[in-house]
Amino acid sequence: MARKSLIQREKKRRNLEQKYHLIRRSSKQEIRKVTSLSDKWEIHGKLQSPPRNSAPARLHRRCFLTGRPRANIRDFGLSGHILREMVHTCLLPGATRSSW
């Protein structure tokens, strides 16, 4: 189980990313439209004004049961070992066991 502070930090980053998403997207579109270099630099300065944690690159996928940041399966939102345990106990319908 991940520490609760790390999970809360991740939630805060996700909220910030949603809050500043439109600002980032609009400024990136403006950079593509503008041809003069000085205007591009000015718009790029606006792009740097939102907080760092609002950047989508700083988000991590976490297992929604344990909060584990590694070995996540995107389709299920679970880490690999939790997914395997749930398949073995027949908690995920339609998933088949693999024998290693």
From Swiss-Prot:
A Gene Ontology BP annotation from the UniProt entry: translation
Alphabetical UniProt keywords: Chloroplast, Plastid, Ribonucleoprotein, Ribosomal protein, RNA-binding, rRNA-binding
Subcellular location: Plastid, Chloroplast
A Pfam family this chain is assigned to: Ribosomal_S14
Record keyword Chloroplast present: yes
Primary site of residence: plastid
Recorded GO MF terms: rRNA binding; structural constituent of ribosome
SUPFAM superfamilies, sorted: Glucocorticoid receptor-like (DNA-binding domain) (SSF57716)
Segments traversing the membrane: none
Family matches, as InterPro entries: Ribosomal_uS14 (IPR001209), Ribosomal_uS14_bac/plastid (IPR023036), Ribosomal_uS14_CS (IPR018271)
This protein's GO CC annotations: chloroplast; small ribosomal subunit
Family: Belongs to the universal ribosomal protein uS14 family.
SUBUNIT field: Component of the chloroplast small ribosomal subunit (SSU). Mature 70S chloroplast ribosomes of higher plants consist of a small (30S) and a large (50S) subunit. The 30S small subunit contains 1 molecule of ribosomal RNA (16S rRNA) and 24 different proteins. The 50S large subunit contains 3 rRNA molecules (23S, 5S and 4.5S rRNA) and 33 different proteins.
Other remarks in the entry: Two forms, which differ in pI, are produced, S14 alpha and S14 beta.
Functional description taken from the UniProt entry: Component of the chloroplast ribosome (chloro-ribosome), a dedicated translation machinery responsible for the synthesis of chloroplast genome-encoded proteins, including proteins of the transcription and translation machinery and components of the photosynthetic apparatus.
Name used for this protein in its record: Small ribosomal subunit protein uS14c
Primary gene name: rps14
